[in-house]
Amino acid sequence: MSELTIDPATTALVLIDLQRGITAGQTVPNAAPDVIARAARLAAACRRRGMLVVLVRVDPGADGALFPRPQADQPRPPLTVTPEWTELVPELDRQRDDVVVTKHQPNAFYATDLEVHLGRRGIRTILLGGISTNVGVEATARAAHERGFEQVFIPDVMAAREVDLHEHSVRRIFPTLGRVRPLDVVLTALA
């Protein structure tokens, strides 16, 4: 594992779907409240270094109407979206300089202005966390990789609905797209 150095001028923190509707469910291997607390700690450290913090939320539309619903062997269950469902969790302590991106698909780059925000600020590296590891985080990671971004994945700031789905992303997918590091290593690099 190589040493981690972070250039605050060219690095952004991107947190995926830490919102009421997503974090209300059971998550593994990290419980959602733990992911939120760690994400808040990481966001505060990034802000202290003057880094861009991007808070991504998903709005699937009324009852999930904006999510794709293909014929599938394991279709997604119906989704009930309340007005609070899309609200970012308050523990993230959103600041005026934070960028909020609203997406309608798992990938935070698809049909959003995320790439514009990153590009105009000269961002080359993304620190990535959120829920769900294997859906929103992985879809965004693949898209970031295709766009040439360096990435640092922080698994203890991630969770999924099933542990094997989380572990597959962390052990098999993310190491091919960037570097996987625990939160304490990232915080040390930010100190």
Please place each PLM-identified region on the residue numbering.
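A short glycine-rich beta-strand->turn/loop micro-motif centered on a GG-aromatic cluster
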Residues: L127-G130, E150-V163
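Active-site-proximal loop->helix
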Residues: E162-P175
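Short Gly/Thr/Asp-enriched flexible loops that form oxyanion-binding sites at enzyme active sites
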Residues: V137-R147
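Glycine-centered short loops/turns at secondary-structure junctions
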Residues: R48-M51, G122, G148
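A charged, well-structured terminal subsegment
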Residues: L177-A191
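Active-site acidic carboxylates
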Residues: M1-Q95, V99, L190-A191
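Internal catalytic-core helix/loop-beta-alpha segment
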Residues: T82-W85, V89-G130
